[in-house]
């Protein structure tokens, strides 16, 4: 319903790995409410959306909001993987990088790959 493009598994893994690293040196928002606020306020650099969210309405607004605010976003297969990547013990439907810390180059590279998928 809300998945607008396919993301190869290796790119998902790269994105989750980046999210784990950013958690150490930068700033991450966890959960749909915090992610939505970060996008609306123009703070989000990259948004992660889990593909297995039920009910899908929880995150269905995020792709449109990201496109409206010109924020790149990526899908990951599992909310469990996303929860682990942001360092919480429970599943996470969505997350956002708001400060990439020392990983600007890695984030820029990933965002370029994502733009290639969206065409």
From Swiss-Prot:
Disulfide bonds: none annotated. It is found in: Cytoplasm. One of its GO terms (molecular function) is rRNA binding. PROSITE patterns: RIBOSOMAL_L7AE. InterPro entries: eL8/uL1-like (IPR050257), Ribosomal_eL30-like_sf (IPR029064), Ribosomal_eL8-like_CS (IPR004037), Ribosomal_eL8/eL30/eS12/Gad45 (IPR004038), Ribosomal_eL8/Nhp2 (IPR018492), Ribosomal_eL8_arc (IPR022481). Pfam families: Ribosomal_L7Ae. Keywords: Cytoplasm, Ribonucleoprotein, Ribosomal protein, RNA-binding, rRNA-binding, tRNA processing. One of its GO terms (cellular component) is ribosome. Belongs to the eukaryotic ribosomal protein eL8 family. Part of the 50S ribosomal subunit. Probably part of the RNase P complex. This is Large ribosomal subunit protein eL8. It comes from Archaeoglobus fulgidus (strain ATCC 49558 / DSM 4304 / JCM 9628 / NBRC 100126 / VC-16). The gene is rpl7ae.
């Amino acid at each position: 319903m809300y998945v607008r493009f396919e993301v190869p598994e290796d790119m998902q893994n790269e994105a989750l790995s980046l999210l784990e690293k950013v958690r150490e040196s930068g700033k991450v928002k966890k959960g749909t409410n915090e992610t939505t606020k970060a996008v609306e306020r123009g703070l989000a650099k990259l948004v992660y959306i889990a593909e297995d969210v039920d009910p899908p309405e929880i995150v269905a607004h995020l792709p449109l909001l990201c496109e409206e605010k010109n924020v790149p976003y990526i899908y990951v297969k599992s909310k469990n993987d996303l929860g682990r990547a942001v360092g919480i013990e429970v599943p996470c439907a969505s997350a956002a990088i708001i400060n990439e810390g020392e990983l600007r180059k890695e984030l820029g590279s990933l965002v370029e790959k994502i733009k290639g998928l969206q065409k």
